[in-house]
Amino acid sequence: MAGLLKESMRIKMYMEGTVNGHYFKCEGEGDGNPFTGTQSMRIHVTEGAPLPFAFDILAPCCEYGSRTFVHHTAEIPDFFKQSFPEGFTWERTTTYEDGGILTAHQDTSLEGNCLIYKVKVLGTNFPADGPVMKNKSGGWEPCTEVVYPENGVLCGRNVMALKVGDRRLICHLYTSYRSKKAVRALTMPGFHFTDIRLQMPRKKKDEYFELYEASVARYSDLPEKAN
């Protein structure tokens, strides 16, 4: 429940996985305000550094995976905050237009004033001469996730654009969010949108990265036609 969450919450993240067969581990620490929808994270690669691929493909598993820090307007039930103290999980498949695929599973739990994230990722089929494996990407454009409930699961569908020089590499994201609480204990939100701006203000030698995200959940601003 939202009462367990404070205006300032800490974050700890533990990530491991492979991308095109390269094994790595990352650890992150950060903080944010769950009620204003802003968060920051500082991430170190603890194994497998320097990464031989663009960290940009992992960034959405960190911040865009940190769904407690989404500002929900008053009329939208907050699925994620309702899920505490038990927490929630999500699974995501990201398909890039050049054939690369990234799958991820994340577990979110709460320990005192700290949110704990455990993330496992698997990246396959990224072209050796593509921008991901050549580390030629330059961050993400802002995007909007379409969110809706289905059989007790919150589904997210998104199209993201990775900046590559003067062009964009497009990818499609399919996410399933599952509360650890029984569905009957939740008030599920209706169809809505989540606007996301994910940035990387700083990185160092492909082994240290700083991320910032702002996100807000909203209904459509467009009025319905009167009868």
Swiss-Prot record:
The entry's biotechnology remark is: Fluorescent proteins have become a useful and ubiquitous tool for making chimeric proteins, where they function as a fluorescent protein tag. Typically they tolerate N- and C-terminal fusion to a broad variety of proteins. They have been expressed in most known cell types and are used as a noninvasive fluorescent marker in living cells and organisms. They enable a wide range of applications where they have functioned as a cell lineage tracer, reporter of gene expression, or as a measure of protein-protein interactions.
Per the record, the GO terms for biological process are: bioluminescence
Q: Which residues carry this modification: 2,3-didehydrotyrosine?
A: 64
UniProt cross-references to Pfam families, sorted A to Z: GFP (PF01353)
Membrane-crossing residue ranges in chain numbering: none
- Coiled-coil ranges per UniProt: none
Task: Describe how it is modified after translation.
Answer: Contains a chromophore consisting of modified amino acid residues. The chromophore is formed by autocatalytic backbone condensation between Xaa-N and Gly-(N+2), oxidation of Tyr-(N+1) to didehydrotyrosine, and formation of a double bond to the alpha-amino nitrogen of residue Xaa-N. Maturation of the chromophore requires nothing other than molecular oxygen. The precise stereochemistry of the tyrosine has not been determined.
Question: InterPro entries attached here?
Answer: GFP, GFP-related
Q: What role does it play?
A: Non-fluorescent pigment protein that is lilac in color.
Which family does the record claim for this protein?
Belongs to the GFP family.
Q: What is this protein called?
A: GFP-like non-fluorescent chromoprotein
Organism annotation: Radianthus crispa (Leathery sea anemone)
